[in-house]
Amino acid sequence: MESEKIIEERLKALRSTIALHDFHYYVQDAPIIPDADYDKLFRTLQQLEQQYPHLITPDSPTQRVGAPPLKVFARLTHQTPMLSLTNAFTEDEAIAFDKRIREALNVDQVNYAVEPKFDGLAVSLVYTNGILTNGATRGDGYTGEDITLNLRTIPSIPLRLQTATVTDQFEVRGEVVMLKADFEHLNEQQRNKGEKLFANPRNAAAGSLRQLDSNITAARKLTFFAYDAVLSHKDQPFFSKHSEILDYLKSQQFLVAQQNGTTTGVAGLLTYYHEMGALRLSLPYEIDGVVYKVDNLTQQETLGYVSRAPRFAIAHKFPAQEASTELLTIEIQVGRTGALTPVARLAPVFVGGVTVTNATLHNEDEVQRKQIMIGDTVIVRRAGDVIPEVVAVIPEQRPAHAQPFIMPDHCPVCGSKAARLPGEAVTRCTGGLYCPAQRKQAIWHFASRRALDIDGLGEKLIDQLIDRELVHTPADLYKLNIDTLASLERMAEKSARNLVTAIEHSKKTTLPRFIYALGIRHVGEATAKALANQASHLDQLMTLDIEQLQQIPDVGPIVAQSIIDFFSEAHNREVIRQLLDSGLQWEIPNHGVQQSEQTNSAVSGKTFVLTGTLPTMTRDQAKIKIEQQGGKVTGSVSSATSYVVAGSDPGSKYAKAIGLGISVLDEDQLLSLLQNISTGAQQ
């Protein structure tokens, strides 16, 4: 049996090894062993400590786990006050700060330490004989809340210092934040549980850190960044600069911002400010400015303090990304695809460096989830070039006259019915062929290659036609003449003549192409073909009810409802009538003959996926040949796929087909199959 001294040495070695791996994983973001090996080490430590509970030490990694809930936080007095920094909001104020420093020190230039200003919760960590013993919030700067148990759950906070300090007590200061990715993950969890979402990472970090139950804190991912240490007179001879303190903290396995640095003079300060402003959105954590500190510690002592802030440091703040203002009303904006988006009209507020009067509310569900009412005081966020959005309501400031928002059931632009399909968050205008807001998208789709295929009618030309009010619906394309088109930018008479010819040629089409060209939501090429096969006359298709539509291949309840909504809208029916009056026509296929041919084809009823580059024909040409013989072409490989036709550079679809055991054909094999008019063709 092992002696207790040997067990104690094993425990010490395990704790040291696990602490090293925690540092590599949580601080350096570069693990050096697999998770399974780490878990094995941790379980071994747990088992030994269960056998020898009297050998458990406060710095053991097992002691990070949550403790029983507290009833209230105790108060802790800071031995050295945690003072806040004076803020600078303009470059002039930063220039004035540098001038005061130079004059007070009687020097021409000053060396500064520069750091990002974290937007989190400032805390203090006290190490006694190298072991973390106390942790507290800033509080009022003199007294904070004892959150030691919660801080111990944060993996990036060392429970033991790597080397001994000169004094028995060593105090580290820094910021607890929630990384942006962890914030998104937490809010996703909150959303799935039907619980309130956090407005921003700072609120999430503060709320998580100030939990009376440290198990809740342990379950949320928090990160600690060290940015200073409180030096005693015994420590001071070992450091001459603030930047040296940060280097020491890194050596003790604290996480220190990579963007820290040093610079000289006010020009260096302002360069750093602008560099960090440009980096701000790409950083993994939120910052609300930068911090300038005189780097020389002797100079810091000379400058001293004023009131509740040091003279030797200042926070240069970025323009606020969040601000509160009154929500005056909610209007509906209709997008180019018919989406109805609620937009908040706001009392003007300066946020993110600009004056904001409008902010997106995304959709009806978001308005309800955030419990937004007209007349509320709301928090508006604008980060960089991101569209301003309302992130939260301040319910305590809700006036008695506040009104709930009701999503309209008709499009505010064209008056068509507005519908929201099952499972979708967006309400949409059903007047796709008529609605002015959807005009450009509707006409571009109508003329696209897979629809009516009007050669020469590109987006820029469509923009001109609509902006000059020459075209309002797709039917107006057939009223255009050479003289009108020749008057447009970059349209000579020859180009105009060619376009008129292309428009005229588009009148002879097929029913599947025409159905697809209408732009019915969720109706792609395959569904358009299925609809045309079921109802060879357009009038017949327009009168099918939802049950009849769902009998058609590829048409489920959502697609069926979308078709019903489209053809129920009088504006759409009028545009279709105008198109037919313009001379659009297609041959009525003889389904009996076609079915007979398809029945005898080895391709009939089979599902194909095309991938890669074929030697002698395009994938579109191959698709047409397959469909002519009753086959179906889809875009993804599944167990329902009959064949994958692979050319050169086939990609992942080929690999998936092999994995599922699906037959893979080359072009020659496909052509052979197409020529094999036999019901007994092998798969």
Curated annotation (Swiss-Prot):
Zn(2+) binds at C411, C414, C429, C435. The keyword DNA repair applies. The active site is at K117 (n6-amp-lysine intermediate). Pfam families: BRCT (PF00533), DNA_ligase_aden (PF01653), DNA_ligase_OB (PF03120), DNA_ligase_ZBD (PF03119), HHH_2 (PF12826), HHH_5 (PF14520), Nlig-Ia (PF22745). Its cofactor is Mg(2+); Mn(2+). Signal peptide: none annotated. GO terms for molecular function: DNA binding; DNA ligase (NAD+) activity; metal ion binding. It catalyses: NAD(+) + (deoxyribonucleotide)n-3'-hydroxyl + 5'-phospho-(deoxyribonucleotide)m = (deoxyribonucleotide)n+m + AMP + beta-nicotinamide D-nucleotide. One of its GO terms (cellular component) is cytosol. GO terms for biological process: DNA repair; DNA replication. Keywords: DNA damage, DNA repair, DNA replication, Ligase, Magnesium, Manganese, Metal-binding, NAD, Zinc. DNA ligase that catalyzes the formation of phosphodiester linkages between 5'-phosphoryl and 3'-hydroxyl groups in double-stranded DNA using NAD as a coenzyme and as the energy source for the reaction. It is essential for DNA replication and repair of damaged DNA. Belongs to the NAD-dependent DNA ligase family. LigA subfamily. This is DNA ligase. It comes from Nitrosomonas eutropha (strain DSM 101675 / C91 / Nm57). The lineage of its organism: Bacteria, Pseudomonadati, Pseudomonadota, Betaproteobacteria, Nitrosomonadales.
